[in-house]
């Protein structure tokens, strides 16, 4: 059974259709890259799958449980939606760290709040220990007490990845995680994501890094104009695209 099943997702902003009948599934432990030009719908799709945007139509299921059905009001209650978001970790383009908190505090804050409000039984000590271990995995053992303004863009994005992983999500979403970085800092973030893929972390990554998508992702979806033009195994889609629109898009990158 697929860990994630997305069926017939549609989204409009006003009268403008942004997502048109999007359907796909993802197996546990796989990495899926979503590629496409700016404005193709990648970010909106990720936001709909994390309920930061509400789809106008469609069904989203995780592990066989229907989390959202546009035709079922019971799946759209805001209090329930907040809990359903815990299935997903989100890494944003622009880091979105809290400037008033250290790297370690950014990573552990949500878990600490949940332990208090939901009475999860977790101790503050265990949450801090896990947060430190995550930052060590990100190569930031010596930056735990630094504030965001004291970190490079690449370091901030690695903190953001650790923060998302700290909530132990079923699926990690990364929305163009290197787009706000200088070229020399891109590699350190891609290295971290590559390591997560090797550890079979279930991920969906919106990216403009074609070589990275080819080498790291198990599956690739190419979007254009709010529709899925082509999808399949990453190397098949990128090395031997079947659709003319996909070939045209990828040819621009091969010429760079």
Protein language model features and the residues they cover:
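Conserved ABC ATPase signature
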Residues: 147-151, 155
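ABC ATPase NBD coupling module
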Residues: 67-89, 124-125, 237-241
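Short coil-to-helix segment of the ABC ATPase nucleotide-binding domain corresponding to the Q-loop/switch region
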Residues: 101-110
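Catalytic Walker B motif of ABC-type/P-loop ATPase nucleotide-binding domains
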Residues: 172-175
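A short, proline-enriched helix->beta-strand linker immediately N-terminal to the Walker B motif
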Residues: 166-170
């Amino acid at each position: 059974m697929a860990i994630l099943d997305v069926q017939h997702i549609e989204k409009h902003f006003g009268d403008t259709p942004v997502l048109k009948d999007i359907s796909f599934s993802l197996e546990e432990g796989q990495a899926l890259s979503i590629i496409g030009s700016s404005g193709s719908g990648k970010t909106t799709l990720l936001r709909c799958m994390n309920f930061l945007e509400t789809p106008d139509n469609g069904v989203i299921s995780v592990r066989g449980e229907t989390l959202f059905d546009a035709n079922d009001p019971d799946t759209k209650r805001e209090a329930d939606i907040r809990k359903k978001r815990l299935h997903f970790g989100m890494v944003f383009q622009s880091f979105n760290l809290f400037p008033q908190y250290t790297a370690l505090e950014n990573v552990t804050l949500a878990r600490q709040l949940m332990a208090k409000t939901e009475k999860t039984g977790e101790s503050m000590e265990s949450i801090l220990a896990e947060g430190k271990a995550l930052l060590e995995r990100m190569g930031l053992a010596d930056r735990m007490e630094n504030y965001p303004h004291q970190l490079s863009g690449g370091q901030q994005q690695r903190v953001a990845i650790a923060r998302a992983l700290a909530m132990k999500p079923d699926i990690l979403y990364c929305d163009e995680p290197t787009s706000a970085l200088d070229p020399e800092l891109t590699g350190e973030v891609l290295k971290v994501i590559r390591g997560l893929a090797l550890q079979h972390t279930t991920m969906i990554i919106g990216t403009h890094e074609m070589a990275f998508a080819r080498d790291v992702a198990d599956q690739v979806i190419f979007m254009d104009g709010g529709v899925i033009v082509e999808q399949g195994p990453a190397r098949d889609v990128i090395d031997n695209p079947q659709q003319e629109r996909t070939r045209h898009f990828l040819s621009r990158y091969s010429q760079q």
